[in-house]
Amino acid sequence: MIDLYTWTTPNGRKISIALEEFGLPYTTHAVDISKDEQIKPEFLKISPNNRIPAIVDRDNGLSLMESGAILIYLGDKTGKFLPKDGEARYRTIEWLMWQMGGPGPMLGQVHHFVKYNKGKAPYAEERYLKEAHRLYGVLDKRLADREFVADAYSIADMAIWPWVSRFEWQTVDLNQYPNVKRWYTTIAKRPAVQKGYKVPKDVGEVPMP
């Protein structure tokens, strides 16, 4: 049994979607970041960086923060969606790290400046929107000749998809990136994605282009 500490953010949805895909039993603990629940002492014991998501694996008592580390752990624990060795494993981790270092922080800045503070910092808006489109272009090129980023559906797709699901927040038209659009809609139809998207609470249907 996994205890999942999460909220309705792209990083949080990575893990709820993954747990559904892995078929692992889990208990959800909502951490409402709008109420600063992530800085409560009891949560800091699990996630010293006071960020969601975090997990505790009751099978062995292990607690983990950082969504990328959690995805690798769950992949290794179950033997699913993360190859055990060889190039396939490292391609999967490569694209997981791409998400952690690219779309995660950069699209997060787009949300901050474009959605929540539009007009307050034109330079920042221009900079991060430009980077958002560059990243979408990288992903579109990667998907030009393959169904998923590491060929087979993997934890890398689970990491990237929730950030693309906020394409409207990013003022991105997925029609500009047809390979991303095809990939996005394919994954959006997966039952585990539909279910995991609504954890820890239902805030609406999966956005569709």
Give the residues covered by each predicted segment:
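Positions that flank functional sites
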Residues: I33-S34, R182, D202
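Short Asp/Glu-rich motifs
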Residues: E37-I39, T186, V206-P207
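Charged, low-complexity, helix-prone segments enriched in Lys/Glu/Asp/Gln
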Residues: Y90, G196-P200
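GST-like domain detector, emphasizing the conserved glutathione-binding G-site
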Residues: M1-E126, K130, D140
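Acidic/histidine-enriched, glycine/proline-rich intrinsically disordered or flexible terminal extensions
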Residues: P200-P209
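GST-like fold's C-terminal all-alpha helical module
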Residues: L74, L96-P191, G196, P209
